[in-house]
Amino acid sequence: YCQLWDWTINALHEITEYNPKIKIALEYKPNEPRSFSLMPDVSTTLMAIKEVGNKNMGVVLDFAHVMYADEMPAYSANLIGRYSEILGVHLNDGYGKWDNGLMVGSVRPIQIIELLVELKKLNYKRAIYFDTFPDHSGLDPIKESSTNIKTFKRLNKIADKLINNSDLNEAISNQNASQSFDIVQEYLFK
């Protein structure tokens, strides 16, 4: 594994050195059913980027991969924003045991809202796109895409209202989970 890590870091260094104007994105994922992942989580990925040492490397944050890695999406986004750069966001959803690729907000709408709030705090202006698998469940891909867009717009409007909500910010500062949850639900279930 150490040799594999060294080869990977050296290859990424060579790739990023080739043209420093081109951004190179890493997308971490815990594993696949029959394979091991060298960068299974945000911490390992950020460590790799630091070791590569070039500014043109960042991270694609995939919501389902973050859940699969047992991470909190907003916290992972914050760490990436602090130590590197978010170069893309895959919005989808899942149960956290596999890369489900479900429709946006179908399982974890509150975590998606929290992620969207964090992305706004980070002044994220790059692409947000959907990494879902309509073909796995026989859905019409056009209808599913339309539903993803509609849901994203709804959740993003809620995030816009929550980012500067003084009651929510106070509840968070006081670590009052009940009050925070009540405030978010008030907007989510209007």
Where are each of the predicted segments found?
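Gly/Pro-rich active-site loop or hairpin
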Residues: 35-46, 65-125, 133-147
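A structural motif corresponding to the C-terminal end of an alpha-helix
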Residues: 14-24, 51-57, 115-125, 155-162
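Alpha-helix capping and helix-coil boundary motifs
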Residues: 3, 20, 72-75, 137-143, ...
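Hydrophobic faces of well-ordered beta-strands that scaffold small-molecule active sites
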Residues: 24-26, 57-61, 87-91, 126-131
